[in-house]
Amino acid sequence: MKPRIIAKQEEIKQVINSVDVCHIGMIDLEGNPYVLPFNFGYEEGVLYFHSGPEGKKNDIWKQNPSVCVAFSSDYHLRYQHENVACSWSMKYRSVLIYGKVEEVTNLDEKRKCMNIIMKKYSGRDSFEYSMPAIKNVKVFRLIPEKVEGKAYGY
């Protein structure tokens, strides 16, 4: 059985919304792959992330904002014959999003983006942010340039 392409936007959205953490791959300043887990928000096809004011990923994104974001869900181990190793497989659904990360610097926009992230985890989108907190947090958005989805066993 081959993986099938996930083409329907609704199924792609379902995979993205079903995971708590995504993994963002980038190329570091020495040309090496670098992957980090992130909390995220997703609304109207746009991804949102946040981080501290300094760090390796911030330095990377200033030089090369191109990323690949991975989401995977619905894992289920299965087999046809319990004692035959090659009959075992893993059901899954996955989505990859490619694009360029852009920093959000407008304070009102940062609050909106942070509330999109908070809504994913809390169900609420009406949080307050102190001025020092909203000034110090780095907020990023990614408008997808390319989206790929695959499912195996579903």
Regions found by a protein language model. Give the residues of each.
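Broad gene-expression machinery/nucleic-acid interaction feature
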Residues: 21, 35-37, 66, 92, ...
